Curated annotation (Swiss-Prot):
Lineage, highest ranks first: Eukaryota, Metazoa, Chordata, Craniata, Vertebrata
Localisation per UniProt entry: Secreted
Signal peptide segment: 1-19
Keywords: Disulfide bond, G-protein coupled receptor impairing toxin, Secreted, Signal, Toxin
Species assigned in the record: Bombina maxima
Protein name per the record: Prokineticin Bm8-f
Family indicated by similarity: Belongs to the AVIT (prokineticin) family.
Length: 96
């Protein structure tokens, strides 16, 4: 039981700390490296990861076009890389 309590406390400290970002996990684009954005997880919009910008032929979201974003990105997809645009291709949007 003591170990369980310690794990819970550790998880709470991690969840509410704003000073440290675990590698790959982010809150905003500014915390990610060049060529990436802070995209929402496909499973939970409360969890975000640094994800590479879209390359030619990769799926994109038409409303996700600015890096760094002014707020928290809601899409699980990053904008397209420099020089590419997000356009509709059949049923999906792709970087081209």
């Amino acid at each position: 039981m003591k170990c369980f309590a310690q794990i819970v406390v550790l998880l709470l400290v991690i969840a509410f700390s704003h000073g440290a970002v675990i590698t790959g996990v982010c809150d905003r684009d500014a915390q990610c490296g060049s060529g990436t954005c802070c995209a929402a997880s496909a499973f939970s919009r409360n969890i975000r990861f640094c994800v590479p910008l879209g390359n030619n032929g990769e799926e994109c979201h038409p409303a996700s076009h600015k890096v760094p974003s002014d707020g928290k990105r809601l899409s699980s997809l990053c904008p397209c890389n420099t020089g590419l645009t997000c356009s509709k291709s059949g049923e999906k949007y792709q970087c081209s």
